[in-house]
Regions:
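Short cysteine/histidine-rich zinc-coordinating motifs and their immediately flanking basic loops
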Residues: 220-221
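Conserved mixed alpha/beta catalytic, RNA-binding, or beta-rich assembly cores of soluble enzyme
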Residues: 83-147
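Short N-terminal helix-initiation segments at or just after the protein's N-terminus
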Residues: 26-30, 138, 157
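Short terminal or interdomain "cap/linker" segment that borders an active site or interface and mediates
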Residues: 142-217
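Conserved active-site and cofactor/substrate-binding residues in soluble primary-metabolism enzymes
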Residues: 29-32, 36, 122, 126, ...
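Active-site helix-to-loop segments that bind/position phosphate- or nucleotide-bearing substrates
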Residues: 1-112
């Protein structure tokens, strides 16, 4: 169960602005506020990750390992239909960023709170990309290919499977817990699964294009 102590040297400003619900075309937005939020996020982030490769039975949709899990939802089963093993991962940037963001809002510093929250989201997605790349490299060493990562709540994969999925990953090892409402805590955390097979790798679609939540304010097509 490899641990990943990632590093964050930068945060994608374009992604950060998207998560903040701000168009990159808005030229008059104060750059110093953006830069300040990025600096604060980088200073407060506590990047941690965990991942492992587990056997997978595509006929039954079951992940093997110490805590076997049978997946439900047509979209995830279809996504993994050619996989005989899967990479599972969980990452977090810790809770200090969300505490700081909450403090900004509490003090009436709404812009700072919004931008810091968005920077944290961009940061944890970047961390997930790093672990995703590790799994891709591990699969390639045995001549296998991966498909893009998929998280509980995508498509019709019910988020209610989050507790069992995180147990299969071992997410508690890096301080990630699941709330009674199946949300991850710390809030700026990600869990995901990546199919591994002999099939040629498929290009990853735009993240939003793969999601059916048409009303999402972060949607970017």
């Amino acid at each position: 169960m490899p641990l990943f102590n990632g590093t964050l040297f930068q945060i994608d400003q374009k992604e950060m602005m998207r998560y903040a619900g701000l168009s990159p075309k808005v030229k008059e937005f104060p750059q110093d506020a953006i830069d300040s939020a990025i600096r604060e996020a980088l200073a407060l982030a506590e990047p941690r990750g965990i991942w492992q490769i587990l056997p997978y039975d595509p006929e039954n949709g079951t992940i093997g390992g110490a805590h076997p899990l049978t997946l439900t939802g047509r979209s995830i089963l279809r996504h993994l239909s050619h996989a005989w093993s899967v990479g599972v991962l969980a990452v977090t940037v810790g809770e200090e960023i969300e505490k700081a963001s909450g403090a900004h809002f509490k003090n009436g510093e709404y812009l700072q709170g919004l931008l810091l929250d968005a920077a944290a989201t961009a940061a944890v997605e970047h961390l997930a990309d790093q672990v995703d790349a590790l799994i891709q490299r591990e699969a390639a060493r045995s001549g296998q290919h991966t498909v893009w990562r998929f998280s509980p709540g995508y498509g019709d994969w019910p988020v209610t499977q989050q507790p069992d999925f995180c147990r299969a990953i071992g997410a508690e090892t890096i301080g990630i817990h699941v709330t009674d409402h199946a949300m991850l805590s710390p809030r700026k955390s990600v869990s995901a699964i990546i199919g591994i097979s002999q099939c040629s790798a498929r290009p990853a679609p735009a993240k939003c294009r793969a999601c059916g939540l048409m009303s999402c304010p972060f949607r970017n097509l």
